[in-house]
A protein has these predicted regions:
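N-terminal interaction/assembly modules
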Residues: 1-125, 129-132, 136-175
Length: 175
């Protein structure tokens, strides 16, 4: 599983929690259950491969991090979505932005540009294509407010980095 797929899986978990209200740890453990997980591969290709141990740690971290800071993350979204009430933004798009903001603020190993690019990709995939511009505008404004450089990252660089991560993860699991 690539880091991008792990991020997409995190969005699924965060979004699912919007409806169940379950504790973050339970959401992750239930979805990754050895009996249940294989059934999900028929629903979405991101479930074709099981996440590595490092990716499970990532999922635990971001799902609980977003859950524990949801109000603050929504306040940030509200502040930068000028002219929009945060409750008018689809839950899924809001979850995508919550994850990206959490990564920007708390995940030092995730470059700001990657967090934003991935959020735009996921928003376009799961919402309307024009949602990508909306998400990009909000997250870009937020990043600029932090004086965080939003580096230009090409799709090729992202894919190359994900392939390297996948190779490193496999090598680490073999040790």
């Amino acid at each position: 599983m690539t880091r991008g797929n792990a991020r997409e899986l995190a969005v699924h978990l965060i979004y699912g929690r919007e409806f169940t209200g379950e504790e973050p740890e339970k959401v992750v453990s239930t979805r990754l259950d050895k009996e249940y997980y294989p059934q999900l591969s028929t629903e979405n290709e991101i479930y074709a491969d099981r996440p590595s141990k490092a990716q499970v740690r990532y999922l635990d971290t971001v799902v609980s991090g977003v859950a524990n800071r949801q109000d603050a993350l929504n306040e940030i979204i509200q502040k930068f979505s000028i002219g929009w009430d945060v409750t008018r933004i689809s839950k899924l798009t809001r979850c995508v932005m919550q994850l990206a903001i959490y990564e920007i603020l708390h995940m030092e190993d995730v470059p700001t540009g990657v967090a934003i690019s991935e959020a735009v990709r996921l928003a376009k995939k799961y919402d309307a294509p024009e949602t990508g511009s909306f998400v990009n505008g909000i997250l870009g404004s937020f990043a600029r407010s932090l004086n965080t450089p939003v580096e230009e990252v090409s799709a090729e660089e992202i894919l190359s980095a994900e392939e390297e991560e996948a190779v490193e993860a496999v090598a680490a699991e073999e040790i």
